[in-house]
A protein has these predicted regions:
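Bacterial c-di-GMP phosphodiesterase EAL domain
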Residues: 1-94
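EAL-family c-di-GMP phosphodiesterase catalytic domain
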Residues: 8-13, 106-110, 139-228
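EAL-type cyclic di-GMP phosphodiesterase domain
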Residues: 24-47, 75-82, 92-127, 158-179, ...
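Solvent-exposed, well-ordered amphipathic alpha-helical segments
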Residues: 55, 62-64, 79-83, 87, ...
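Short, flexible, glycine/charge-rich loop motifs used to bind or transfer phosphoryl groups or to couple energy/partner
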Residues: 58, 91-92, 121, 142-144
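Structural preference for beta-strand elements that scaffold enzyme active sites
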Residues: 65-69, 100-104, 127-131, 152-154, ...
Length: 228
């Protein structure tokens, strides 16, 4: 498992460390997930959660106030409160504050909306923070926002890429940012790779970013960001 920071570029600090699944030879999450059968999704999802908490706590994340961001599979959760027990046990063992755990899910995964809302509301009641990942690349982003407002929305890297030179992308990102501001949801732009993209996003008012410009994922370590 690797960690990549999410940066507050205004305060120049790490807001969160995102736990990223990696294979034994460094394969990315997409490859690893493609090897998981439907029957194994629940066990895999549970293992990823507890491993992320154990590793992050061992690296000192629990004590520095930053969030731990964990990606979860909504279709692997059959009943929210039953499926969260191992996560709560792991957090308890590690003395990891529940309010410092952020659960991300991607809108590209087809999932029953009522089921997803049940998960998100249960997690919020426990004290976890929530985020929609890859916003703008999936099926139901705006419709979901009408029913549930997460703490964060991560704008998809395909919209961020070349935002400084692509007028259409810039207009779309600006529009999404206005909607999120109206809903009091914090925006995170992911996949920021160039100084020009960074400057364009700053001009649009973005303060939370993630990408290779700041730090690449670090295997079993907390990557230290560099600043443009």
């Amino acid at each position: 498992m690797a960690f990549q920071p999410i940066i507050d570029v205004v305060e120049r600090k790490v807001l969160a460390q995102e736990a990223l699944v990696r294979g034994a030879a460094g394969e990315d999450a997409g490859f690893v997930l493609s090897q998981i059968s439907d029957d194994s999704r629940y066990a895999f999802d549970q293992l990823c959660r507890t491993t992320a908490i154990d590793l992050a706590a061992g690296l000192g994340l629990a004590g520095d106030g930053a969030l731990l961001s964990i990606n979860f599979l909504p279709n692997a959760v059959y009943e929210p409160r039953a499926c969260i027990r191992q996560t709560l046990l792991a957090a308890g063992r590690a003395n990891f504050p529940l309010q410092n755990i952020l659960f991300e899910f991607t809108e590209t995964e087809r999932v029953d909306t009522a089921h997803l809302l049940g998960i998100l509301n249960a997690y919020r009641a426990i004290g976890f923070k929530t985020a929609i990942d890859d916003f703008g690349s999936g099926y139901s982003g705006l419709r979901l926002l009408a029913q549930f407002q997460p703490d964060f929305v991560k704008i998809d890297m395909d919209l961020v890429r070349d935002v400084d030179t692509d007028r259409a992308k810039r207009a779309i990102v600006a529009n999404v940012l206005r909607k999120l501001h109206d809903l009091e949801i914090a925006a995170i732009c992911e996949g920021v790779e160039t100084v020009d993209e960074y400057r364009c996003l700053r001009n649009l008012g973005v303060r939370l970013m993630q990408g290779y410009l700041f730090a690449k994922p670090a295997f079993a370590a907390l990557a230290e960001p560099t600043w443009p």
